[in-house]
Every structure is written in structure tokens, then in C-alpha cells.
Amino acid sequence: MRRLWGAARKPSGAGWEKEWAEAPQEAPGAWSGRLGPGRSGRKGRAVPGWASWPAHLALAARPARHLGGAGQGPRPLDSGTAPFHSRASGERQRRLEPQLQHESRCRSSTPADAWRAEAALPVRAMGAPWGSPTAAAGGRRRWRRGRGLPWTVCVLAAAGLTCTALITYACWGQLPPLPWASPTPSRPVGVLLWWEPFAGRHSAPRPPPDCRLRFNISGCRLLTDRASYGEAQAVLFHHRDLVKGPPDWPPPWGVQAHTAEEVDLRVLDYEEAAAAAEALATSSPRPPGQRWVWMNFESPSHSPGLRSLASNLFNWTLSYRADSDVFVPYGYLYPRSHPGDPPSGLAPPLSRKQGLVAWVVSHWDERQARVRYYHQLSQHVTVDVFGRGGPGQPVPEIGLLHTVARYKFYLAFENSQHLDYITEKLWRNALLAGAVPVVLGPDRANYERFVPRGAFIHVDDFPSASSLASYLLFLDRNPAVYRRYFHWRRSYAVHITSFWDEPWCRVCQAVQRAGDRPKSIRNLASWFER
């Protein structure tokens, strides 16, 4: 599956990397499988050992006798790559570890047996043809000075480079453009925001943002005055405001409300909304070339009224889905070489982390999968809950980010599980705050399209909540292994999407790039709910 974060590049400069390099490498295999004395909630309770962990986590934590060795302890765990089992391959792993942390998802990992077989082969002399008797016997065969490599080797090398380039293009060529990717042409475009997202229909409009200053997108004319409807090349409709309250479409089809009773928000009756949308789709003479953009940042489980929207009513979609016409995720990683990046030494020191697991939840619902999993996990490890409802306590005055920064792990549990639905719970509450996210949402492969595999822990990697708890406690006792979950900070920084101005500017950018190509959405509900 294609990933949406760029290639890693190690920046210069010192920071927490020096602290990590000087830290002692503790041996995970020395853990006995039972909790020793420690903080409250972590002692006196038996938990499963490495046998119940996923293969790529358990192999590195086994004692040496389980790997066929003798007298040597296991190597520290690498959450980003599978461990190697031979001494020669272990040296290779230590030399290539930074590159392997961000290896492409387009290539499968090499089985451990292959590494053992490779380590057992005799060393081939440099320049000797593959399969020659000299190479098989481990001898050396010298070429005459000045001749260089045979032409067959050069041809094979060129063919290999060509194949690599083609595979790279196939894996990366069709990715949706990242928001910081390329400069934008300066074609003048007017974009009208029909309602401000999450602010309600009748809130006072804020001044439009400067897209050139915020996102280096020029030629944008952002509009809030509905009298400018005929001048706009695109009109944004926020789904939540679209399906609540009386119909409020562009004139002359919209119903204008004037009294307090009329502006009271309510979910439209299905037949009423469907009839209004169908009439609008079939009889609306829009200005030439104008696009209606459906905008939504909620999951299908929390998007009522989808099926009441008529076919061909909208031209584009704007959402967190990567296959939207305008892709605006809740956040993303970008290379630190980008101008204005914060300094690289941002990994929080372990001395400030006084708690183990934190969770901030605003809507408590016992029917949700995240609440059910919390009840299972809290039986084996202490979880401090903040927010409204359930066992939550108020967020301290220092704020959410500073509170989460005091914990080693954060439960980035989504309220529903859908494709690409990865919200601020991962980007802001965990990655930006400096805690290792434990995620519950779409599958691991979906997460790895947006973040490196070694930057998070997925609940699906473990057969049970008790097995996950044992792994979290293992990381708590092995700080050198825990720090590996912050390797991505060497090369990337976190961008948090602003839902006031960023969708506005991204639509302007998309119109500039698309030109006058016509399009309409035939069945919005079937696309979004799949």
C-alpha cells in the first residue's frame, strides 16, 4: 500500500539523539515475566511474557536459548524492523538501522532463515562473477589493472537501477499531492464558504485568511459574503450544517430563516431533505464553471443524512479520505528541511514522564469499541482518564498537551473505525505532545500510509489487552527500547490542520490545478460509507 509520508533524511544538529546514544542498552530478554516493585498499579500482578506478543516484537525479547544461541542475551528490540538472528547479520542491522527504520512498504522484509543462509556462505571476492568456482571456494580472483568490471556486470547494474526506478514510480507516482509538495500557479480563483465549519450557521464570519502567507498559495480570493455567490468558482458546504436546520441553499432555492424558532437546529426529515436536494440538483442554473464542494471531517458513523443528498448535487469532495478530490487530513508529517521547522531536539526527556498511560475522551459511550477495550486494558495496567463522562477527571490547568507529555503512552482511540479516519487524537494529543500513541482505528496498514511503522503501537498487534499491557510494561522497564519510538522525530515534524482556513485554501489550490474539467458525484453516500 502506498504511503503518504516522504523519505527520511537525517538532519544535522544535536538534541535528544545524544541522550539516546549514551543511554545503556538494557536487555529485554532479562525480564522474568512478572512485575517487580514499582509505582502504584504495576506490582504484584502476573502478566504474559514475550510468548503472547506479535512475532516482530517477541523475537527480540526472547532469551538467547530460544534463538539457538548460548551464553548471549538478546539484542534490544527494534519496533520498526524484524530482528536478525546471526552475528554477521546483526552487524549489518546496526549499520543499516537508520535506513531500515523507514523502509518502503512496497518491499517485503527478508525472512530470518535467508539471513542465516547468507551469513553461512563464503565471501565472494570483489569483482568475481556470481557462481564462479573461485567465488564458491572463497578464494580471490584479481582482474588486471585498468580493465575494471566486465561489461556484463555493468549491464546488469544498469538494468537493476532501471527496474528500481520503475518500481519506485509505480509505488509513489499516484499518491495524492501533499499540502507542502509543489508551488501553485497564480490563476485567480474565488472560493465562497457557505458556513464556517463547527461554528454554526449564524455565527459572525471571521476575516478570511491569507493563503499566500499561510500556505504559499497565491491567486486566492476567499469570500464570506453570500452576495458574492455568482462570482465564486467554488462553494464549500459543510455537511453537518447542511443536514441540520431548515434548508439553506444558495438563492433562489434557499429558505431564509428569520425567527429564533426557525434557526433552531434539527436533523431534517429524510423525505423533506431528499425532496429539497433533488429539486436543487435538477433545476439549479449555477454560474458557468462553478463547483459545489461537499466538506466533511466526521466519520460515516457520525454523518447523518448522507443518503438524503441527491446524486450529481456536488462536483467535488473534501475530507480526511485520501481518495477525496481535495485531501485535507487531520494532520501529517513533513520533512524538517522545510523552512520554519522547529528545532530537532523535541523528544521529551524521560525524567518528566511520571505516568504510564493517559487517555483524554470527550464523549463516553459504553457501546463504543474504544470504551470496551479500555475496560479490558485497565484490568492489567493503570490508565489515567481525563475528560467528560465515565471515570474521567478534569484536564489540569497546564493544558492537554502538557498533561499528556507527562505520560509515556497515550490511547489514541477513535470513536469509530473507518478508512483513513485518523484524527487529532494521533497527530495532536500523542505525536505532538510527545507520547507514544497506542492506536485503535483502521488497520495497521492504513496507519502506515501516514506515519512510519515504528512510531506507534497498534492494538491489533496483540491477541488480547493483557498481552498489550505486558508489552507496555516491558517498554516502561527498558528506556533504551522505548526511545526507539521517537526515531521519526529526527527527520519529521508534525503539522496540525487548521479547519478554519486550510480547507478554504486547499480548494483554491485544487481549482487552479484542475482547470475547467467537469465532474459530478453520482452517489456520495456509497463512496463515503464503504
Swiss-Prot record:
A Pfam family: Glyco_transf_10
Involved pathway(s): Protein modification; protein glycosylation
Principal location class: Golgi
Molecular function terms, GO-annotated: 4-galactosyl-N-acetylglucosaminide 3-alpha-L-fucosyltransferase activity; alpha-(1->3)-fucosyltransferase activity
Compositional bias ranges of the Basic and acidic residues kind: 88-106
Keywords on record: Glycoprotein, Glycosyltransferase, Golgi apparatus, Inflammatory response, Membrane, Signal-anchor, Transferase, Transmembrane, Transmembrane helix
Protein location: Golgi apparatus, Golgi stack membrane
GO biological process assignments: fucosylation; glycosphingolipid biosynthetic process; inflammatory response; Lewis x epitope biosynthetic process; lymphocyte migration into lymph node; oligosaccharide metabolic process; positive regulation of leukocyte tethering or rolling; positive regulation of neutrophil migration
Cytoplasmic side: 1-147
Chain positions carrying an annotated carbohydrate: N216, N315
Enzyme category, top tier: transferase
Ranges in the topological domain labelled Lumenal: 173-530
Region feature Disordered, mapped onto this chain: 1-48, 66-113
InterPro entries assigned to the protein according to its UniProt record, in alphabetical order: Glyco_tran_10_C, Glyco_tran_10_N, Glyco_trans_10, GT10-like_C_sf
Its membrane topology: Single-pass type II membrane protein
Record field: catalytic activity: a beta-D-galactosyl-(1->4)-N-acetyl-beta-D-glucosaminyl derivative + GDP-beta-L-fucose = a beta-D-galactosyl-(1->4)-[alpha-L-fucosyl-(1->3)]-N-acetyl-beta-D-glucosaminyl derivative + GDP + H(+); an N-acetyl-alpha-neuraminyl-(2->3)-beta-D-galactosyl-(1->4)-N-acetyl-beta-D-glucosaminyl derivative + GDP-beta-L-fucose = an alpha-Neu5Ac-(2->3)-beta-D-Gal-(1->4)-[alpha-L-Fuc-(1->3)]-beta-D-GlcNAc derivative + GDP + H(+); an alpha-Neu5Ac-(2->3)-beta-D-Gal-(1->4)-beta-D-GlcNAc-(1->3)-beta-D-Gal-(1->4)-beta-D-GlcNAc derivative + GDP-beta-L-fucose = an alpha-Neu5Ac-(2->3)-beta-D-Gal-(1->4)-beta-D-GlcNAc-(1->3)-beta-D-Gal-(1->4)-[alpha-L-Fuc-(1->3)]-beta-D-GlcNAc derivative + GDP + H(+); an alpha-Neu5Ac-(2->3)-beta-D-Gal-(1->4)-beta-D-GlcNAc6S derivative + GDP-beta-L-fucose = an alpha-Neu5Ac-(2->3)-beta-D-Gal-(1->4)-[alpha-L-Fuc-(1->3)]-beta-D-GlcNAc6S derivative + GDP + H(+)
GO CC list: cell periphery; cell surface; Golgi cisterna membrane; trans-Golgi network
EC number: 2.4.1.152
Family statement drawn from the similarity comment of this UniProt entry: Belongs to the glycosyltransferase 10 family.
Role this protein plays: Catalyzes alpha(1->3) linkage of fucosyl moiety transferred from GDP-beta-L-fucose to N-acetyl glucosamine (GlcNAc) within type 2 lactosamine (LacNAc, Gal-beta(1->4)GlcNAc) glycan attached to N- or O-linked glycoproteins. Robustly fucosylates nonsialylated distal LacNAc unit of the polylactosamine chain to form Lewis X antigen (CD15), a glycan determinant known to mediate important cellular functions in development and immunity.
PANTHER family cross-referenced by the UniProt entry: ALPHA- 1,3 -FUCOSYLTRANSFERASE (PTHR11929), ALPHA-(1,3)-FUCOSYLTRANSFERASE 4 (PTHR11929:SF132)
Protein name listed in UniProt: Alpha-(1,3)-fucosyltransferase 4
Naturally occurring in which organism (per UniProt): Pan troglodytes
